[in-house]
Amino acid sequence: MRNLLVLTLFIFSSIATSNAAITVMSYNVENLFDSLDDPGKDDKAYLPYSLKQNKDHIEACNKVRVEKWKNECLYFDWTEAAKNKKLENIKKVILHSNKNGPDIIAFQEVENINVLSELFELLKPYGYIDLALLEGNDYRGIDTGYISKYKIDYKKLHKIKFSPEFKSKDTRPIFEVHIKIGEQLVRLYNIHFPAPYHPVGMRNDSFTTLENLVNKHSDPFIALGDFNVTSRESEEHNTFYKLEENWAISNHEGCIDCKGTHYYWRDKNWSYLDKIMISKNRGLAFNSSSITTVITEINTNDDKIPEGFDTKTGHGVSDHLPIFAEILL
């Protein structure tokens, strides 16, 4: 009888372990800045208009070559009220994705730990207990960060190792953190690869750096973020299908009704710039039916295309849609 009881407990324990799951989201929140001047960073566009009236600021802005960016630098009114409204919109989109929000959220384009902490405080009532952001070298100060319902045990930035022709260039590092789900260590890699206007080789080097990182250990891993590979580039270079031996990729596994995460108005087409990728053969699997982009009235226009935050109307969040998935362990 005792042996039967032990066997029964073992079976139920095994079932519970195999049914463990976490929900994750990646969200490029497009220029989530606080309203303060961050020394050493080029954040002068994201200040209140009242602080932009001095001669030094105006002269610095007039040196900006791109007209749109110059006008933002001179006239964009990024107040505390505007920032707080954007944070509230982000919170609502996150909570729309899943009851009380996903377990782990990887963010891209966050200025600093201060503004991430403000978002964390808004999300705390929904079970979030930890956050992480390490300052990288981006000249504008935009970084990657996490907010999590699991304790974050380890934090490290990994610089991209570029080929000789790109040695003079720098880009955002890969942000690795560790969490434990029960006794299982899971490694996460937050991605914000070089923008599409940079050479394809820079993104190829970024993928190589990521592959080298995950090949150094045998733990299950999740890479999620803004890979910045357009649909055209992906088709021409077979970017993601080449990875399928070792990776399961969100929009290959599910998201059947999704169009993409970013819309290019000039070309009138969608791209999956943002993805969730998980290790194959290391105990992880997607719940394919769970994979989706998060579309609400708050973060899209009438055509369900993502819209950046408008300080005048208070509508929008980002030119990216967040992507969400449940991952089984």
Language model region names:
Residues 23, 212-222, 229-329:
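Metal-dependent phosphoester-hydrolase catalytic domains
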Residues 18-122, 135-136:
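N-terminal, active-site-proximal structural segment of metallo-dependent hydrolase catalytic domains
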Residues 105, 132-133, 163-164, 173-255:
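Extracytoplasmic, non-cytosolic globular domains
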Residues 24-29, 73-79, 83, 97-116, ...:
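Active-site beta-strand/loop signature of hydrolases that rely on acidic residues for catalysis
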Residues 29-33, 110-114, 136-140, 151-153, ...:
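Solvent-exposed loop/turn segments at secondary-structure junctions
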